[in-house]
Amino acid sequence: MKIDLNADLGEGCASDAELLTLVSSANIACGFHAGDAQTMQACVREAIKNGVAIGAHPSFPDRENFGRSAMQLPPETVFAQTLYQIGALAAITRAQGGVMCHVKPHGMLYNQAAKEAQLADAIARAVYACDPALILVGLAGSELIRAGERYGLVTREEVFADRGYQADGSLVPRSQPGALIENEEQALAQTLEMVQHGRVKSITGEWAMVTAQTVCLHGDGEHALAFARRLRATFAEKGIVVAA
């Protein structure tokens, strides 16, 4: 069994360099919620050094709230903003002799695109316009995954080690109790259940079916590095190969 392990990087966390030795894919902030040209360049350099797959992590234009504010923007605006961000990272990656492999939206752009078909379509269209060979990463079973498939993109369905799930397979909003899993044992058990058995227990007790092709580790979590090491060790024990 193989699984991709990804982390959101270039967002100002001190643990980026170490996380890049533990993950197989990096989603690099492109300036709209965090990061800038220098951090993008530094993250790309480290990712190439560690053999980690490079991806763009575009966001709504919301540095003030770290891309976590809901926005209702015209699809053409979202298309242009997404293309702008992924194009910038693609150029920075190419300039350093690397290849950009995937795109994963950030924060509220990701969450809204999971449910809003027009928004999902604008993102998928931007990815396709930039490079049809790019992989589109989205919440398992979401509108974003369906939009990517409509454009003929390779999609990668994502699950979260440290997030609570609702009965419909969507994430519990960060504003609600149960959104974040702080207990390491619980996060580890949830991850293995999703990867090995394709299901996750919701905060209300029901099982939701999920397709786990990539697992997200949040690099900004307090125990991110320790948990990443433990997850890698557990995967190795279970014969699960970590690779993009």
From Swiss-Prot:
Pfam families: LamB_YcsF
Catalytic reaction annotation: 5-oxo-L-proline + ATP + 2 H2O = L-glutamate + ADP + phosphate + H(+)
EC number: 3.5.2.9
Superkingdom: Bacteria
UniProt GO BP: carbohydrate metabolic process
GO MF annotation: an example: 5-oxoprolinase (ATP-hydrolyzing) activity
EC class name: hydrolase
Alphabetized UniProt keyword annotations: ATP-binding, Hydrolase, Nucleotide-binding
Family label: Belongs to the LamB/PxpA family.
The protein's role, per its UniProt record: Catalyzes the cleavage of 5-oxoproline to form L-glutamate coupled to the hydrolysis of ATP to ADP and inorganic phosphate.
HAMAP family attached to this UniProt entry: PxpA
Subunit structure: Forms a complex composed of PxpA, PxpB and PxpC.
Name of the molecule in the record: 5-oxoprolinase subunit A
Species this chain originates from: Escherichia coli O6:H1 (strain CFT073 / ATCC 700928 / UPEC)
